[in-house]
Amino acid sequence: MAASLAGKKIVFVTGNAKKLEEVIQILGDKFPCTLVAQKIDLPEYQGEPDEISIRKCQEAARQVQGPVLVEDTCLCFNALGGLPGPYIKWFLEKLKPEGLHQLLEGFQDKSAYALCTFAFSTGDPNEPVRLFRGRTMGRIVVPRGCRDFGWDPCFQPDGYEQTYAEMPKAEKNTISHRFRALLALQEYFSSLTPGVGDDHPSWGSGEG
């Protein structure tokens, strides 16, 4: 049961140190478990975002034989019917941020949304995988800002003049799709362990 995980380690499936750093910063010191990063080779599933997240989490839990947290991020262009969506990783590798912007060159609609899904498994195959989602609306722009974090340079959230890459990390971490998904995750764990997360400095900033 998830309620019995307080104080224990959860394997966060990532080989990206910056991603782990950002997740820990957002969750804060009130999160009842310790996240440890571990790179795991998972199959590249295809399908809808929820389906992909569940299958990846189930496979990660099978390999780890314990509690795991798996993150999937989609960048969805409305003009392209939601693409690249869960396949943004390969689009970014081939096209870079400039190419992502150029994909929409022939479209008036530059709107997009960033979707983050965290899938959590206790490690027990008989328990369902739980999904926690966060979405931030924005638009695709000419890349600006630091190039050390994926497609951040070409995504400008609604209501802001800066791209994700131009924002101070602390500011980005109060509006991002990742923040919103982690807020849902934190609230779930807080409901299992009363008093946890009550004093998080960013609470209330993530609901749009």
UniProtKB/Swiss-Prot annotation:
Keyword Coiled coil tagged: no
Keyword vocabulary terms for this entry: Acetylation, Cytoplasm, Hydrolase, Magnesium, Manganese, Metal-binding, Nucleotide metabolism, Nucleotide-binding
Cofactor remark from the record: Binds 1 divalent metal cation per subunit; can use either Mg(2+) or Mn(2+).
Pfam families named among the record's database cross-references: Ham1p_like
Protein's UniProt keywords contain Nuclease: no
GO cellular component, one term: cytoplasm
Subcellular location as annotated: Cytoplasm
EC class of the enzyme, as a word: hydrolase
GO molecular function: dITP diphosphatase activity; ITP diphosphatase activity; metal ion binding; nucleoside triphosphate diphosphatase activity; nucleotide binding; XTP diphosphatase activity
InterPro entries assigned to the protein according to its UniProt record, in alphabetical order: ITPase, ITPase-like_fam, RdgB/HAM1
Cofactor field: Mg(2+); Mn(2+)
Cross-referenced SUPFAM superfamilies: ITPase-like
EC numbers, comma separated: 3.6.1.66
Family listed: Belongs to the HAM1 NTPase family.
Subunit structure: Homodimer.
Identification of the protein by name: Inosine triphosphate pyrophosphatase
Organism from which the protein derives: Bos taurus (Bovine)
